[in-house]
Amino acid sequence: MFKLPKLVIVTAIAVGSFSYVAPANAEDQLAVSICEYIAADDKNRLRSKLKSSRVKIRNIYDAIQCNGNNLLRHAVASNAVGTGEYIVKNLSKSSLADGVDIAWAEGNHAGSPLIAVIKDRAGL
């Protein structure tokens, strides 16, 4: 008597479970590529990847973490001066004005040439 509704429910569940497709991890792949290009200090490939993905550094700066660091800290830690300067130039002055990244860089990588670039951009 209740076989038809049970059959419909079971069929719906089965079809639903097989038809689910996990979302493509394009964002994850973009983040991995950006982190790799920063670590390799490859500014040209970084610019190309950002342009082809139609994103800007200032829009993704807070969202992407590379080895637990933001993009600028990752550049400082990787001694990636070229990509670090590119990141600094594409960030707003207000995002650097708090001095948190400068303090982190001075505390952990005092010899980095990016510290002067960050200070100059932030107006400190």
Language-model segments: what does each one mean?
Residues E27-Y37, R58-L72, L96-P113:
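Ankyrin-repeat boundary/"N-cap" motif
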Residues G123-L124:
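Short, solvent-exposed mixed-charge patches
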Residues D41-S53, N79-K89, G111-K119:
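Ankyrin repeat structural motif
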Residues M1-V10:
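Bacterial N-terminal signal peptides that target proteins for export
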